[in-house]
């Protein structure tokens, strides 16, 4: 075992055999997606989508103090709260030209099941869904100079995000670790694979206070001590200014989409382009 942990280790035959058997219990449960819509004034049959997952893990591996409740305060109560705040913002601004859909999906942590179910059984046709934005876990470390776009370069929605970011003095940047496949690990993927252009970004890795070093330290601390663990709880010391900055971008992107007659598509050659073209052609 010690040798296997060393660089350059190569597998060796153990000349052993093993026989295993195990039992599995299957629990069937029902959970709900929650959807709200603000009807558009000029093109009510065209839809702009906001998504966030409201579920988390429930009980999980207990912490040292015995707490075994995974509350999911950051992941994803922050996104769910943002969804409600955006709906309130749209209501205060007045109905846009296109309809705005606010979708809180369940069972993301169980394999994107809620968004998958909606995408396959949509309340509003995906062929008439212009595009959307997904929100999954906001950074509570304060405002950033940049924003990290997951899947940057995939669709024409980047243009809307770039315009929104410019108005806030921020710079969209490509995710530093695309090999981790984050674009395929949250609810926007359920819609993307059926053709709907979706944008997803994170708060940024260059904080206004502390720069990249502070951002990395905060991210590592969250992943080590709170991510999918009982420690992901509300903290009165949270810095909400970064959340508000990100929320403005989500609002601007959705509002711009809802106030235009343009139909942004996946960029030429993208894996989801063909299914979108087929959906829009009605074939």
What are these regions (language model features)?
Residues 1-2, 43, 95, 105-223:
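Metal-dependent peptidase/peptidase-like ectodomains
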Residues 27-29, 47, 73-80, 108-111, ...:
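Solvent-exposed, acidic/flexible segments
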Residues 80, 84-87, 112-119, 158-162, ...:
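Extracytoplasmic/secreted envelope proteins and their assembly/folding machinery
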Residues 88, 92, 207-276, 280:
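His/Asp/Glu-rich mid-to-C-terminal helical/loop segments that flank catalytic regions of hydrolases
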């Amino acid at each position: 075992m010690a040798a296997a942990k060393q660089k350059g280790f190569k597998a060796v035959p153990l000349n052993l055999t093993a026989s295993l058997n195990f039992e599995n219990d299957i629990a069937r449960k029902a959970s709900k997606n929650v959807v709200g819509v603000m009807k558009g004034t000029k093109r009510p049959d065209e839809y702009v989508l906001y998504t966030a997952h409201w579920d988390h893990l429930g009980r999980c591996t207990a912490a040292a103090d015995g707490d075994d409740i995974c509350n999911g305060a950051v992941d994803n109560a922050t996104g769910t709260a943002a969804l409600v705040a955006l709906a309130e913002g749209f209501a205060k601004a007045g109905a846009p030209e296109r309809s705005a859909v606010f979708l809180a999906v369940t069972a993301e942590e169980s394999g994107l099941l809620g968004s998958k179910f909606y995408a396959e059984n949509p309340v509003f046709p995906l062929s008439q869904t212009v595009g959307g934005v997904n929100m999954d876990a906001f950074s509570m470390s304060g405002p950033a100079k940049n924003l990290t776009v997951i899947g940057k370069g995939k669709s024409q929605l980047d243009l809307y995000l770039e315009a929104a970011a410019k108005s806030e003095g921020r710079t969209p940047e490509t995710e530093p670790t695309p090999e981790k496949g984050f674009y395929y690990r949250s609810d926007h993927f359920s819609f993307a694979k059926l053709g709907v252009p979706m944008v997803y970004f994170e708060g940024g890795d260059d904080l206004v206070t502390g720069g990249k070093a502070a951002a990395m330290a905060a991210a590592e601390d969250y992943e080590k001590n709170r991510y999918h663990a009982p420690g992901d709880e509300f903290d009165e010391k949270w810095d909400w200014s970064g959340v508000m900055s990100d929320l403005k971008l989500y609002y601007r992107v959705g509002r711009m989409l809802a106030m235009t007659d343009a139909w942004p598509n996946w960029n030429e050659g993208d894996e989801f382009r063909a299914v979108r073209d087929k959906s829009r052609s009605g074939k």
